[in-house]
Design a protein with these regions (language model features):
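Short, well-formed alpha-helical segments that are part of the catalytic scaffolds
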Residues: 22-34
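GT-A fold catalytic core of metal-dependent nucleotide-sugar glycosyltransferases
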Residues: 70-120, 143
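Short, Lys/Arg-enriched N-terminal segments with co-localized hydrophobic residues
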Residues: 1-9
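Short catalytic/ligand-binding loop motif for oxyanion handling, primarily in non-cytosolic enzymes
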Residues: 23-25, 94-96, 101-102, 119-121, ...
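Active-site-proximal specificity loops/subdomain of glycosyltransferases
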Residues: 42-76
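Short, solvent-exposed loop/edge-beta patches enriched in aromatic
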Residues: 10, 35-40, 77-85
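A glycosyltransferase accessory/donor-loop signature
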Residues: 10-18, 37-39, 45-48, 141-235
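Conserved catalytic core of nucleotide-sugar-dependent glycosyltransferases
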Residues: 104-165
Length: 235
């Protein structure tokens, strides 16, 4: 008689918004996630040519990136099952993503960092308009309980207004939005966000050090170290 113990390996399903003007940011972020994770991670870029059969929304001048709205396709891409994490590509993971994964709470449809601030500038990277609205940057880092995000069908994501999507009007109540520590989406050089030594995830929301205009922003030295590691080839 043999007793078999089956250990289920839980994969952390992670989606990163891909922006063709910030290719290096995507690569360094993906590397930083893998480097610091103690659990297996699957990383899927939300790259528009890959999802054009379902995501057909036209980009407008208020869409600062190619993934401004396609991020809300994550539940559909997960077949509305399990959990998925969405991240903007202009971030750098310093903590263990497995620690975040342990914070999942099934009573919520989405868990995120509830920022309470208003950007000072009217423009950000590449001269893009800095839009100002309630729940600004909440959707830039979302832990999504996909079976509770069933309203996010391709038809809805393709047709809803930006505010309906980014202010989570597709949920019955804000009570379905769980709170995560701000250190998981630390906004670089924004009001109220000083440079801390202990943060889990840095977000270069104004523009990152891969742009010459932001080469000396806070945490630029940290990003450059990861970039150097990511680019190094052993010979």
């Amino acid at each position: 008689l043999y007793l078999y113990i089956v250990l289920m390996v839980v994969l952390i399903n992670l989606f990163i918004g891909y922006y063709s003007k910030e290719k290096v940011a995507f690569s360094v972020l993906a590397y930083s996630i893998l480097r610091n994770s103690t659990k297996p991670v699957t990383i899927t870029p939300i790259y528009l040519p890959n999802i054009r059969d379902d995501f057909v929304r036209e980009r407008n001048n208020l869409s600062s990136t190619e993934f401004s709205f396609s991020r809300f396709m994550v539940p559909h891409l997960m077949n509305y099952k399990g959990w998925g994490l969405f991240m903007d590509c202009d971030q750098l993971m310093l903590g263990d993503i497995a620690e975040l994964w342990r914070l999942r709470d099934d009573k919520y449809a989405v868990q995120l960092c509830k920022h309470d601030y208003t950007p000072v500038e009217d423009k950000k990277f590449l001269g893009q308009v800095q839009t100002k609205y309630e729940k600004k940057n909440w959707s830039s880092f979302m832990l999504m309980n996909c079976n509770k995000c069933s309203e996010l069908t391709p038809d809805y994501v393709n047709s809803a207004t930006g505010l309906q999507l980014h202010q989570f009007k597709w949920l019955e109540s804000d009570e379905l939005i769980g709170d995560l520590p701000l250190e998981w989406n630390w906004l670089v050089d924004e009001p109220g966000y000083n440079t801390k030594s202990k943060v889990n995830n840095i977000h270069f929301t104004k523009g990152g050090p891969w742009f010459k205009e932001y080469a000396n922003c806070s945490y630029s030295e940290t990003w450059n170290l990861y970039h150097e590691e990511c680019s190094w080839i052993e010979r």
